[in-house]
Amino acid sequence: MTIPTSISGFPRIGRDRELKKAIEAYWKGNATLDDVRETGRELRVRHWRLEKDAGIDLIPSNDFSLYDQMLDTAVLLNVIPARYRRLGFDNPEETLFAMARGYQGERGDVTALPMKKWFTTNYHYLVPEFDSSTEVRLNGTKPFDEYLEAKSLGIETKPVLIGPYTFLKLSRDAEAQELTIDEGLVDAVADVYAEVLRRFAKLGAQWVQLDEPYLVLDKHEGDVSLFKSLYSRLLPARDSGVRVLLNTYFGNIADIYETVKLFEFDGVGLDLIEGRDENLKAVEHHGVAARTTLFAGVVNGRNIWRNNYAESIALVEALQQVTANVAVASACSLLHVPFSTKGEEQLGDKVLRHFAFAVEKLEEVREIADLMQLDDDAKRQSTALAANQALFDGSRVVADEVVRARIAALADADYVRRPERGERQRLQREALGLPLLPTTTIGSFPQTKQVRAERARLRKGEISQGQYDEFIRRQIDDVVAKQEQIGLDVLVHGEFERNDMVEYFGQNLNGFLFTKNAWVQSYGTRCVKPPIIWGDVSRAQPITVAWSSYAQSRTAKPMKGMLTGPVTILNWSWPREDITHEEQTKQLALAIRDEVLDLEKAGIRIIQIDEAALREKLPLRESDWHREYLDWAIPAFRLVHSAVQPSTQIHTHMCYSEFNDIISDIDAMDADVISFEASRGDLVVLDAIHDAHFETEAGPGVYDIHSPRIPSVEETEERIGESLAKMDVNKVWINPDCGLKTRGNDETWPSLTHMVQAAKAMRANLD
């Protein structure tokens, strides 16, 4: 019996980030919208052919997006807030970009939709927003156009959409924020999906994939009935001849599997990486509907290590004990891994053979399915299976005994800072002499073409290290002078020497590997190139001390030392799979601790340890939060800073996340000051800070740096006022949402000037 193969989705940015380059050229006025459309078409065609040639049977379509798949779904359902409609753009792409980035120009001035992390990944989605004008209906033809585009090439695809349950659970109300999901809304949304199924049936589609990752979360009152209501109304549209694959990922659906089974979906996608044990038990206990094919998600779409074929085969065989209808699939979309290992030959074959990026994962899916066709004797004789097993026999790296000994010697006292925070705050106010509502930035300043060009010249050997260092010193001189000129209270050196907040540190730590082109989409056109944790981690030498010391010598104002924290380095790297995340984080924490103490010795009085990604990997089910994550992630941060003097002020920063539910754990990090990325979330974190009697001083971001908009002084004053209404004035800091690296100077300096003016005005009112 032939075993079908499937993937949930494929990276959309292109092997060389062609999509990013085309869209950004359009935004800068250097390309037309037709150029962007043509680039998109070329990428889709290239990827479909690649997937077909790799032997994938159920090839996805509509997994492509110019910005974000949730945003595309909102547009498809006509969930377009009135403020964007009023802009009156002639083409849907401009409206979509305004929703994603905001708009400031002759047509008006509107903020962007909120942006949040996509479950536990580093991908960000735009939050669909319902307002009083919303009329849910089918809008546009994107999914159908892309299906027909593939069909014209002779490629049959499986259209992919975000499912209605996930779409509604991740949406919000423009006014109340929490969306009221009443019967009328459920029916309207389900009817659109039913119409989509019928249209695809008329076009000849055999399968439609509905992604429902929200099913892996804890179920609250009304959740199961919502799922039932949606699918009871839309599934009869299958009668038109199309099959429906309910696809889940990022965890298990054990608590709703029995309900899912009753609907007799044509296919059910199960994550057998992150939800392995629970999903297997659910299938074994409840069985499988006769018409249902189980899509066994055995190829990891979230890490870059080679698949262990023997383990994957065992998982598929376990499902085959329950049903003969099994397909081999990716555990989630391959959106979250780089394009291909081709072009990374500098790593050497002995290293590279351990990695599989998106293209190689297509081959893994096909190869596992092929191996499943063999009998036991043929499997034992399979050279492919033997070659794969050789990757997992024995140890890949030699342990660093010095690092292991440091970890073994850690005691409880190493995780505790003295004295308590209240006493430290008093000492720090005396030492630093800052005003009420102190102003600062998160760390990075715009990296211009010139900065990137000089870094490239150094890499190519066209300039010496000394010439490059002199260039960086001039950049620091300039940014320090400008910060003083506009009146910021706590300064930063701008991070011009850093290509990336994680990769830069990895390049100065033992145990890391780096790629040339392994880019992954984070949001829109923003891409990241995570380093790879290959072996045990330790600090090779001081990393930031020289630049921070130089910057401090250029000003009498406090200069922040800027570091990336251990949990964020782990979460924004490709972590090892041969030792635990906890062990890797302790290694990183000790390395960054060494850097913190060296900065303090060099006279840096404020040290920021960014934990931008702390919330990102919080398990999706609350019962797992502490046991599987927070019980080691929070102490790891404390380990980094526990040995500094009481007068040294420790800052941290966190990016797009939901903080409300772990606000007490964040307080337990025992930082002195924390800045939150909050402006796109309407500062809802303020309620959590207030209700939890949050002790850490805090700076909820007062403007959104992911949008090119320049906020007015009045707008910023309003934001500050919202903070003051919920927080102790002595604990409020004023700062942007995030680092300014990706913005332009033309946006950055006016925005910061307005921020400082707003802070001074509010300060004067307090006096």
UniProtKB/Swiss-Prot annotation:
Annotated GO biological process: methionine biosynthetic process; methylation
Enzyme Commission numbers on file: 2.1.1.14
Enzyme type, top EC level: transferase
Cofactors named for this entry: Zn(2+)
PANTHER family associated with the record: 5-METHYLTETRAHYDROPTEROYLTRIGLUTAMATE--HOMOCYSTEINE METHYLTRANSFERASE
Residues engaged in binding L-homocysteine: I442, G443, S444, E495, D610
Pathway note: Amino-acid biosynthesis; L-methionine biosynthesis via de novo pathway; L-methionine from L-homocysteine (MetE route): step 1/1
Annotated source species: Bifidobacterium animalis subsp. lactis (strain AD011)
Coiled-coil intervals, chain numbering: none
CDD domains in the cross-refs: CIMS_C_terminal_like, CIMS_N_terminal_like
Name of the protein this chain belongs to: 5-methyltetrahydropteroyltriglutamate--homocysteine methyltransferase
Membrane-spanning segments: none
InterPro entries cross-referenced by the UniProt entry: Cbl-indep_Met_Synth_N (IPR013215), Cobalamin-indep_Met_synthase (IPR006276), Met_Synth_C/arc (IPR002629), UROD/MetE-like_sf (IPR038071)
